[in-house]
């Protein structure tokens, strides 16, 4: 299972939101490039970027920062947030991003996502952000009546690289991932699933291993890394590809 550190960009700073609330912002770093390099140095095999300004407004506010991060790293970078047109998606891919993540457009224009996946094999990810099982869009500001599992199933044959399943209710809370929701999403789709939201400790990461046989291939970790609740090197050693048979014993795994 791949451990993917996250950098959320707001006004070119590295931040985290609590349950997607733009009024509840914690700033962790004013230098996202340095932060990205730090995650790479600690063993990250991929970086997850979110343009929060773009997600909210649809405008490419943080492009210079995105380009700087992509240029500085040797590992693949994936980006989501405000990517709502074919031209915008392919512009970002031309920056050197490995993959782009489409959320709002996946529910509003699913055919566009499928077209992009055909034009850019292996480089399109669908982001499904849900609260109480219903898909949220436009930076989590708008709530739809579409079931997250139904949307996941719709993209089974679309040729996308993966689905990122974010549980809004747990995102940024450190209270643990929604395993029931993730299992339902994995069962609904044959596409590799990346879990996002709620990871607060190593035990949470270990709990996700039970879902690996169902198709959960990775997990995005944000606040737990910044708060020091999870050590990236240790997480990769215990959970990542080539992991040990036994979890590390340097810290207690259960509270």
Swiss-Prot record:
In Swiss-Prot or TrEMBL terms, this protein is called 1-(5-phosphoribosyl)-5-[(5-phosphoribosylamino)methylideneamino] imidazole-4-carboxamide isomerase
Which residue windows are transmembrane per the record? none
Q: What is its EC number?
A: 5.3.1.16
UniProt GO molecular function:
1-(5-phosphoribosyl)-5-[(5-phosphoribosylamino)methylideneamino]imidazole-4-carboxamide isomerase activity
Under HAMAP family, the record lists: HisA
Q: Where in the cell is it found?
A: Cytoplasm
Q: What NCBIfam families does the record tag this protein with?
A: 1-(5-phosphoribosyl)-5-[(5-phosphoribosylamino)methylideneamino]imidazole-4-carboxamide isomerase
Q: Which domain of life is it from?
A: Bacteria
Q: Please name the catalytic residues of this protein.
A: 8, 129
What biological-process GO terms show up in the record?
L-histidine biosynthetic process; L-tryptophan biosynthetic process
SUPFAM superfamilies in alphabetical order: Ribulose-phoshate binding barrel
The chemistry this enzyme catalyses reads: 1-(5-phospho-beta-D-ribosyl)-5-[(5-phospho-beta-D-ribosylamino)methylideneamino]imidazole-4-carboxamide = 5-[(5-phospho-1-deoxy-D-ribulos-1-ylimino)methylamino]-1-(5-phospho-beta-D-ribosyl)imidazole-4-carboxamide
Its pathway, per UniProt, is: Amino-acid biosynthesis; L-histidine biosynthesis; L-histidine from 5-phospho-alpha-D-ribose 1-diphosphate: step 4/9
Member of which family? Belongs to the HisA/HisF family.
Question: What is the organism field in this record?
Answer: Prochlorococcus marinus (strain MIT 9303)
The enzyme's main class, written as a single word, is: isomerase
Spell out the GO cellular component terms annotated for this protein, sorted alphabetically and separated by semicolons. cytoplasm
InterPro entries recorded for this chain? Answer: Aldolase_TIM, His_biosynth, HisA_bact_arch, Isoase_HisA-like, Isoase_HisA-like_bact, RibuloseP-bd_barrel
Principal cellular location given in the protein's record? cytoplasm
Q: By its UniProt entry, which Pfam families does this protein fall under?
A: His_biosynth
